[in-house]
Structure formats: C-alpha cells, structure tokens
A protein has these predicted regions:
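Acidic (Asp/Glu-rich) sequence patches and key acidic residues
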Residues: 1-118
Length: 118
C-alpha cells in the first residue's frame, strides 16, 4: 500500500472536495514513521490533513531535517527496506515541486487548497 497525495478544494454549498491540479507524489506506508518524526504532522490516511499553506511548510522542515541529518532518522526505516530516508526525502521533493506548480497554475486557490493523503 502507498500514500498518494492530492490537492483538493471544497465545493461551495456541498460537503465535497474535488482534486485540482496534479500531485504525483506517493510513497509506501512503510515510510510513515520517518514522515511523522521529520515533519511533526499527524499524517492521517484517507482524509483531509488541513490547508496546504499550513502543511507544506512542515514538509519543507521535514525535508531539511532529512537532508541535514539523515542518520537521525535511519532507525525509523522499515525492515523491508521500502520506507527509507532517501525515498522519503524524494517524496517530499515531489510534493514541493507539485505544490510550486499548483501555486503558479491556480494562484487564486492557494489559500483554500487542502492536503489529502489517500
């Protein structure tokens, strides 16, 4: 199983969210501990994790931590070698690249876009 990320906005007047733009970032569930420890996020699967403008800075911090001190997070790597520090750092880079694209393409939605883990 893997975590797939999407950026969504709420449909006005309806209890529904629709995906906007493209986020191709995904990673194995085995990376959960590394993600949570490096970002401080709760990382709630199959739901809205808050506004992107609040979540993205925590992912930026997590990436810096993984790049500056990868050995600190090695203990959280999965025994099956699927959830690695290196892979998680690349996952964060993919999210950040897709968010940068989103900001350029959908400037008017940046403040209302939500971060979904599916």
């Amino acid at each position: 199983m893997s975590y797939d990320i999407s950026f969504k906005v709420k449909v006005e007047g309806v209890d529904a969210y629709v995906p906007v733009g493209a986020c191709d970032a995904n990673i194995t569930w085995s990376a959960r501990k590394i993600i949570k420890k490096s970002t401080g996020l709760k990382w709630k699967n199959c739901q809205n994790n808050g506004l992107c403008v609040d979540v993205i800075p925590k992912i930026e911090v997590g990436l810096r931590k993984l790049e500056q001190n990868p050995d600190k997070f090695k203990e959280y790597e999965a025994p099956n070698e699927w959830g690695t520090v290196k892979g998680t750092a690349q996952f964060f880079r993919n999210i950040l690249n897709d968010w940068n694209d989103f900001q350029q393409w959908y400037e008017e939605l940046v403040q209302v876009a939500t971060f979904w883990i599916e």
